[in-house]
């Protein structure tokens, strides 16, 4: 990854680590999402392929995080001359400086705990609904909407949906999906009860939960 200089780790999840980085040639600040390819896997993991394809399809929306590039890297092993290099995939995203969870916590955990101002809640919910509507109009369920997956540009007041690793293209009539999805607190009742046939309502339920979270002290 000679093109980028890692500055700090900003997140870590089930599907990889996320770094704040600088593109050396331009000085642009970006986010790098690292996904390791296990040696017994044939090619790129399905979650990474799915996220790449969905982001490319949805990238024209202001309210979806932009995928800038995809980099494949063979990382040499440490202190093992006969070990094959470890293949890695880096997804290069536009960088946003915080997420909704951290932003809410700045209000909730201060010396004077309080919910977000109504004007901010209204703005964020409007942008979230626009992003979700864009996903659904292109036949995509996000399935993991939560404050940690909503990135914020604090200077511009813009909210963007991120982390489509659990996203799915949906069809009519509906087909079966796994019910082992999304963080428990934002999970729709039909998913909690084990249904494998569901549609856009699972994302709308999560939007309602996020709205409640914004107003909770």
Where is each model-derived feature located?
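Activation segment
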Residues: 166-168
